[in-house]
Amino acid sequence: PAIGIATLILGSLCLLLPAPMLEGGSRMPLGGFIAAGFWIFGAALLSGEVMVWLSRSLRKVQFGPVLKLALSRLADGSSRHRLAVAGLVVAVGMVTGMLQMVGSFRGTIERWFDVRFQAELYVSERGSGGAAAINGISPQVIEALSSHPGVDYADTLYISYVDAPRGQTVLAGVDFAAWSERIDQSWHTEPGSLTVEPDAQPALVSETFARRFDVLNGGVVELNTPVGLQSVSPVGIYSDYGNEFGAAAVDHAVWREWTQSERPINTSLFLKDGAATNALRDELRLQFPGLDIRNAKELREVALGIFEDTFRVTSALNGIGITVAMAGLVLGLLAIFAESSSTWRTLTQLGFSSRGFVWTAGLEGAGIALSAWISGTLVGLALGWLLIHVINVQSFGWTLVWELPFVAILLFGVVMVLCGLIGGLATGAWWHARQR
């Protein structure tokens, strides 16, 4: 146990390592990756001790002879038992960590989509694939859209890419007052919490921008715009998951002055009470055939569907990992039974039944799986914290809302124990049949 504990401590100390800066301003979470490896290895080493402690604790309870025998074998903590549980711990830890990562990302993205698609209609240039490949929407068209009788307010977004101290970043033009007060935002730091530096333009910056240019607590960043170098200073920081380059949002008028452009990338239309969303959408599509006009709620569902498709592969990877680990458990049990041949022959001579042997094997498998689930869940929770609060933040510059999927983890434990039981029963029956 001393080596396992030392490994866990060493992994924790690795978190103190600075994250190396990469070209473009992003960072590589070197300490986080090393810590994850040490934690998994340390948990695997300690998992055998967990199995022994758990078995010895349960032996104090009065059980039948079959369960007593299974517990005594687990309590002995042979090298093969420890190896079997260690292999499962690695798989369980990775699956538990990924369950947290995917669940936290899903919950965070859903909240962000609620903010991003809070208007009723979303309008962009037809055929545009991104800010770098569009001409933008005509100012006259934007004026016609915002002045429509059914439209209450148009949240128009202007976008350009500018050079910054570390690579490129996004300079956005927004209705500054509306973004600060009227429109819902997911704030990392509320507007007004930071002091704007003298002779700098107040800006609402994304968390990625703030971390990339070290202005989480305020400061100044110089941007190379078409009219020369301009300084921005954050007055508030919002959460955004749309790009990893970061964005600084200034008022429309300032953006137009700095970029010498008049064309926005898109606009979100907030409709008046009682306005029929789809009817107005169809009307505007006929009036402006060059625009892509969509129901924002439907667009949100499409975006969520893309997200789900992207992360569906993680479920398959989790299943593959557990399947391989359970196959390792079965092979480990076969080796354990072969190693215990003399013990089984002695028990048979003493009148121990074939049925009792098979159930002992099944309970051994279940005990190994339970021990692995306990150890793997503990290290998996630590890995989830590491992925969300260290690796993800240093890699992408944004913070996810950490969500613990307790129900999924508990169900996973039940499935693990059942698979261990069934695998043990099947392995025991097959091995015993061969010996006969």
List PLM regions with ranges:
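Hydrophobic alpha-helical transmembrane segments of multi-pass inner-membrane transport and secretion
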Residues: 3-6, 11, 78-103, 308-345, ...
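Basic-flanked hydrophobic alpha-helices used for secretion and membrane insertion
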Residues: 140, 159-199, 204-297, 304
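Juxtamembrane segments of multi-pass membrane proteins
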Residues: 39, 47-194, 207, 217-219, ...
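Membrane-embedded alpha-helical segments of integral membrane proteins
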Residues: 5-12, 27-59
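Alpha-helical membrane-protein architecture signal
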Residues: 63-71, 75, 82, 296-303, ...
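Peri-transmembrane interface segments
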Residues: 30-37, 105, 109, 283-324, ...
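Short helix-loop junctions at transmembrane helix boundaries
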Residues: 12-34, 377-415, 425-435
